[in-house]
């Protein structure tokens, strides 16, 4: 398989970070037993990381020992229009600091993605009144039951964290508009936007796909340079460069 990360990579890591051991069958039929359950193993070479990411070229993975995490019992999900990509990166840092590292997901969603999405899936609710040029979908989660305690104002501690961060970011000009889910149904609706976007790209026409990994500090300049260069070649190309901002992984797709 690949060293995939997925939507929650910012909190839990990539496949290599989550895999403690493997069983692999080589091309000649030999079985390699690497099913250690240890988080730290100082013995010999770490062969499992050669197989993870090789996509079957070195052998077939037939079993795996995985690291597991407690499921969050409380979460707060928000969709925000941000000033630009650099503002999105700064917002991520603020949410991480305010929540004590509880960010479950932080997804970059530009306007082109939403334009394509609503062409083919108009029934999906728009998170905000207007479509902003650059947006983020973010979620924080906690395994502490107290984080879900409703106070006299109908608020929870984890939601208060999100509200405070967004309010400060709005005052500082990082955030233009935002909404926080108040129910599971509203949370699901926000996630529908992100999870349906790839399907809309397929319907829109030919898609040039890429999977780019960058340092967070380089994302804003990369995005600006790529947009300028591509638009100079063909202004009609829609740039659907969404992705996991938390680990610097962008699916910089062109439609």
Can you annotate each of these PLM segments?
Residues 1-255:
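Noncatalytic alpha-helical scaffold of FAD-dependent oxidoreductases
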């Amino acid at each position: 398989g690949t060293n995939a990360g997925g939507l929650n990579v910012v909190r839990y890591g990539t496949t290599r970070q989550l895999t403690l051991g493997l069983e692999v069958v080589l091309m000649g039929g030999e079985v390699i037993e690497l099913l250690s359950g240890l988080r730290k193993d100082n013995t010999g070479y770490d062969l499992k990381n050669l197989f993870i990411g090789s996509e079957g070229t070195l052998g077939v993975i037939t079993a795996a020992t995985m690291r597991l995490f407690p499921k969050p019992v409380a979460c707060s999900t928000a969709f925000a229009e941000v000033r630009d990509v650099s503002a999105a990166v700064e917002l991520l840092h603020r949410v991480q600091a305010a929540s004590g590292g509880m960010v479950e997901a932080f997804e970059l969603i530009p306007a082109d993605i939403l334009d394509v999405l609503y062409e083919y899936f108009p029934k999906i609710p728009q998170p905000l009144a207007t479509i902003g040029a650059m947006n983020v979908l973010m979620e924080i989660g906690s395994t502490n039951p107290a984080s879900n305690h409703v106070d006299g104002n109908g608020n929870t501690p984890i939601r208060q964290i999100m509200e405070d961060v967004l309010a400060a970011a709005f005052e500082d000009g990082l955030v233009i508009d935002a909404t926080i889910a108040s129910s599971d149904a509203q949370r699901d609706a926000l996630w529908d936007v992100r999870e349906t976007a790839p399907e809309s790209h397929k319907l829109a026409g030919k898609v040039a796909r890429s999977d780019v990994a960058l340092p967070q500090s380089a994302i804003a300049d990369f995005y600006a340079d790529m947009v300028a260069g591509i638009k100079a070649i063909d202004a009609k190309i829609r740039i659907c460069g969404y992705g996991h901002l938390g680990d610097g992984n962008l699916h910089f797709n062109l439609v």
